[in-house]
Amino acid sequence: GLTMAVGVQAAGTVHIYNWSDYIGETTLVDFEKETGIKPVYDVFDSNETLEGKLLAGRTGYDVVVPSNHFLGKQIKAGAFQKIDKSLLGNYANLDPALLKRLEKNDPGNQYAVPYLWGTNGIGYNVDKVKEVLGVDKIDSWAVLFEQQNMKKLASCGVSFMDSADEMLPAVGNYMGLDPNSTNPADYKKAEEKLLKVRPYVTYFHSSKYISDLANGNICVAAGFSGDVFQAKARAAEAGKGVNIAYAIPKEGGNLWFDVLAIPKDSTNVKEAHAFINYLLQPEVIAQVSDYVGYANPNPGADTLMEQSIRTDEAVYPPQAVLNRTFVNFELPPKVQRLMTRSWTKVKTGK
């Protein structure tokens, strides 16, 4: 038994860099109980933030969580080490169809393991929107991207995500342009559209809107499906009659996949694999999905999930809605730079 005890002591730590509001309530505590490995946990709320750290080369992390369309470029830049599947006994639990989709960004699924997936759309306060716009439900991006609507909504508060990568494709797609355009003229059009509504945006932030929707501080937010789900759950818990809903507008929204990857500079590679393998247990990821309101790639988790959540169309959209979504492609660095400049203009309103 002596060697075992040493093994546990040496189990050490795993440094995790994940999206905000994106893990189960007890996942980290449970992981430490089960493995003896101590998780050290930090959060970010945009792909741009994570990419900046990864491409600078010294991350200090062992597990990071990029989105599908950023992954390919990061792999090519040598940001990750290959996953050792012999250390992932639970790998077979993953949905083969989803793994196949991810091969577009990670040929042979060598560097990344799917974590959760979701959509971008609009979260809103049902009663306030009815009062201000006179509609029972939101079904179009026009609510956020047309001046006449935004003028009215400014009185109850509107938030946009603080990310070129999340917002510009949504505007382009709404305008009938290619959401994955490489044409500078398209981004100019999207930028002009956004500058017109810019005066009515309360703030740009990619996570604060959860609590602000829940407590009635804002009435509409461009946001991630599960974050709006969490706002709705918090509002219901508070019992103050704030009624939150989520819409994937008829023009479509972004469908994305977030993955687990191990940075090149990870010094706790075994522990990183242990954490990833832990998340591949159906009962573990079921609890994560139940808490954060994002879909998971683990079919074995379906029956273990809270069925009201598993059947919630905001969490698992039906095929007809999925058909309207678009997936972001990996864009050339020069288009990414253009988007970043464009976004800075929108935010400063100049």
Task: Give the label of every model feature segment.
Residues 11-74:
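Early extracytoplasmic/lumenal segment of secretory-pathway proteins
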Residues 72-119, 136-145:
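Hinge/lid segment of periplasmic solute-binding proteins
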Residues 75-83, 100-101, 106-110, 200, ...:
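Ligand-binding "clamshell"
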Residues 81-92, 142, 238-254, 263-265:
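Short beta-strand->loop
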Residues 123-128, 172-176, 256-268, 287:
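A bilobed periplasmic-binding-protein/Venus flytrap-type ligand-binding module shared by bacterial periplasmic
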Residues 152, 156-245:
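Ligand-binding pocket segment of bilobal, Venus flytrap-like solute-binding proteins
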Residues 211, 319-350:
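Conserved C-terminal helix/tail region of periplasmic/extracytoplasmic solute-binding proteins
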Residues 258, 263-324:
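Mature extracytoplasmic/periplasmic domains
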